[in-house]
Amino acid sequence: MNNTNDVLIQLMQILEDGTAGLTDAARRLDELSYTAQAGTLRELAQQRIAFHAEMKIVAEELGYNPPEAGTIVAKLHRGWMSIKDRLSGESPDGILEVAEQGEHHTVSVYEKMATQDIPERLRAAIVAQLAELRSAHETIKALLASR
């Protein structure tokens, strides 16, 4: 595999994982009657869906067709996050902390991918999404701080 395809695969997988994680966190917050926070996380999950669609278009423009399913490593990470979430007692703070950690990881991956040897079209999409991901990360930090 070449570097461009590897980058596309990693980005699309982390976006899929983010969608699943944020959706699950929103569901759990709804169950605890934290509907405003849940709504924010649902909006961020929708953002991930839009980012994934954009990356798919970029991939097709560049002649790539990355797979849609998450990796084993990502599935293990989600499993660990689920265990960690359960150990937190399903508290709103625990759920938001796990979401914040997921956002931190996503931003870190995007920052790394932006420095790779990739076509400028892909780099531009990464940089644009990274700015919004940083904002999303700050939003979740603010939700935690307001608790």
Listing of model-derived features with the role each one plays in the protein:
Residues I57-V107:
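Carboxylate-rich helix-loop segments that flank metal/cofactor sites and access channels
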Residues T19, A26, H52, K56-A59, ...:
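A structural signal for well-ordered alpha-helices, especially hydrophobic packing surfaces
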Residues Y34, L41, P67, A74, ...:
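Alpha-helix boundary/capping detector
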Residues N3-I14, Y34-A53, P92-L96, R121-S135:
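Alpha-helical scaffold segments that form or flank carboxylate-/histidine-based iron centers
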Residues A38-V73, I140-L143, R147:
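Conserved alpha-helical segments that form or flank metal/cofactor-binding pockets of metalloenzymes
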Residues M1-L32, D93-D117:
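Alpha-helical bundle segments that constitute or directly flank the non-heme di-iron/ferroxidase center
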